Regions:
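Histidine-centered divalent-metal-coordination microenvironment in nucleic-acid enzymes
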Residues: 68-74, 83-87, 421
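Compact, glycine/acidic-enriched structural inserts
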Residues: 78-141
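C-terminal regulatory/interaction module of P-loop NTP-utilizing enzymes
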Residues: 184-476
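Long, solvent-exposed, polar/charged low-complexity segments
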Residues: 1-17, 132-200
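Acidic-basic catalytic patches of nuclease active cores, encompassing PD-(D/E)XK
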Residues: 2-44
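A short, conserved, highly charged catalytic patch centered on acidic carboxylates
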Residues: 20, 46-51, 91-94
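Residue-level detector of short, conserved catalytic/binding motifs and their immediate flanks
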Residues: 51, 67-70, 84, 224-226, ...
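Amphipathic, interaction-prone secondary-structure segments
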Residues: 32-76
């Protein structure tokens, strides 16, 4: 396939996806066109490192330097293309209208769906100063014919993939995936053309949902102590209790701001059974002490301790010296920790611990690095779910929230996305129940996020969603 043939093939597919050319070479032929087509595929361009073709913003000129995002392909040869680099590029004039788009995490997530072992992505798509060094190193090592052109544009390629044309059909399919993603970003086309874009993107392999229970059980086997973290509604406590069904004995404790060492481990409390007028105290066995005693007395049993909302308490005050017992590999350490009448180097081998942590509650205690090292951390993500016959999962509403978080949430803010439990309602009254849940549970939650300074760029999208689905204004 020649470079010109590759260009024409990609252009034809772009028109199927809704591209309407505004120009033909330097002449404007359709002022309402949604893209400017650039093409430099003559022989000298392959010598001086300037061979490419691109679909750029319709607001740019047919020639000269340009701004903003573009779909670009750099072929390696004029007469026989052996490989090419397909890119989301930025014009050498930088950003003019696309900076806001570049700043949204959703754009990078959109293109990351195209990831292969030959694709390269900058951490920030706003960055047009640093070099795409991994791409450049790969080109220098294995694709010398493309070295000059990639060297010329090495700072303005936020997303790229090296495509080999050894298998022409496979190569074109990969290129069309990138083209469809760019078309989706630019919102090209009629309803029918958007369906063509969607059909192309549906060919992408879908990530498999993790088997949370299986993965957590594996962690318990290897690490013993696991924290389940996630946003409200992701099923942290439910999952812990589900896993608990496989244990012989389960102990459960929910932490709160006033939880202390004597509550969790061991202490004293007033003895109210005495008739004497003199105040007397008796031993107060905390749940950890009781768990240890039981484990020592029942060495053949599997014991699980569940600590719900572990970061609601001041962990230094709650754990004290027993902090050192939560060590899944004690090594040669022989220091004993005293817990009332017990002296331990570590927790008994038949005890495992699951703690839960709400990542959305920003008022909670910070978990220090020493505790993080002692526990394995497993994140429960929101996901679609199958429910019983009398209930229904409100997939449409769930996806509307998921789309907003995908588009606007930073990596940290993704931990705030409401979980699937919010979207499970009774089948008999599903619409009314979902509306009430949005008004009285989800709207206050989102307003709290916004008040704390999170997801501010998504504010208008949330306002529109709540107004559309409930008829209620988020802000009067």
């Amino acid at each position: 396939m020649t470079a010109k043939e590759l260009f024409q093939t990609v252009l034809d597919k772009a028109k199927e996806f809704g591209l309407t050319a505004k120009n033909e070479r330097r002449a404007i032929i359709d002022p309402k066109g949604n893209a400017i087509i650039r093409e430099n595929l003559e022989a000298p361009a392959f010598t001086d490192g300037s061979a490419f073709f691109a679909f750029i913003s319709s607001e740019e000129e047919p020639a000269g330097q340009y701004s903003d995002f573009s779909f670009v392909i750099f072929p390696d040869d004029k007469e026989q293309v052996n490989s090419c680099v397909v890119c989301l590029g930025v014009g050498s004039s930088g950003f003019r209208n696309d900076y806001q788009t570049a700043s949204l995490p959703g754009l990078r997530r959109l293109f990351l769906k195209l990831k292969t072992d030959k694709s390269y992505f900058k951490t920030s798509f706003e960055d047009i100063e640093s070099t795409s060094s991994d791409l450049l190193n790969e080109i220098k090592t294995n694709n010398l014919c493309l070295r000059n052109v990639i060297e010329s544009y090495k700072t303005v390629l936020p997303a790229s993939q090296i495509v080999s044309l050894d298998d022409k059909e496979k190569a074109l399919d990969a290129i069309f995936m990138w083209l469809a993603t760019y078309a989706k970003m630019r919102a090209w086309g009629s309803a029918a053309q958007k369906r063509a874009i969607a059909a192309q993107l549906e060919k992408l392999p879908q990530p498999e949902l993790p088997d949370d229970e299986k993965e957590i059980n594996k962690l318990l086997d290897t690490r013993k102590y696991v924290v389940l973290q996630g946003a409200p509604g992701t099923g942290k406590t439910y999952t812990a209790l589900k896993i608990a069904e496989n244990f012989d004995k389960v102990f459960f404790e929910q932490f709160h701001a006033e939880t202390n060492y004597s509550d969790f481990v061991y202490g004293l409390e007033p003895d109210t059974t005495q008739t004497s007028t003199q105040l007397r105290f008796k031993a107060k066995e905390g749940v950890l002490y009781r768990t240890i005693k039981y484990a020592q007395e029942h060495k053949q049993e599997k014991i699980l301790l569940i600590i719900d909302e572990i970061n609601r308490a001041n962990l230094s005050n709650v754990l004290g010296p027993v902090f050192y017992l939560f060590e899944y590999q004690s090594g040669t350490r022989k220091v004993k920790t005293k817990v009332e009448d017990l002296e331990l180097e570590k927790l008994p081998d038949n005890i495992k611990v699951i703690a839960t942590m709400n990542t959305a509650d920003r008022s909670l205690a910070v978990v220090d690095f020493a505790l993080r090292r002692r526990f394995a951390w497993y994140t429960l993500r929101p996901h679609e779910i199958k429910v019983g016959e009398d209930k229904v999962f409100m997939k449409k509403v769930y996806n509307q929230f998921a789309d907003i978080f995908f588009e606007y949430a930073t990596d940290e803010e993704l931990n705030l996305q409401p979980g699937q439990s919010y979207f499970i309602v009774e089948k008999a009254n599903k619409n009314e129940e979902m509306k009430e849940r949005m008004v009285y549970e989800l709207m206050p939650l989102i307003k709290e996020y916004l008040a704390e300074g999170y997801l501010l760029k998504a504010k208008d999208s949330f306002c529109d969603l709540f107004l559309k689905e409930t008829g209620r204004l988020m802000y009067e």
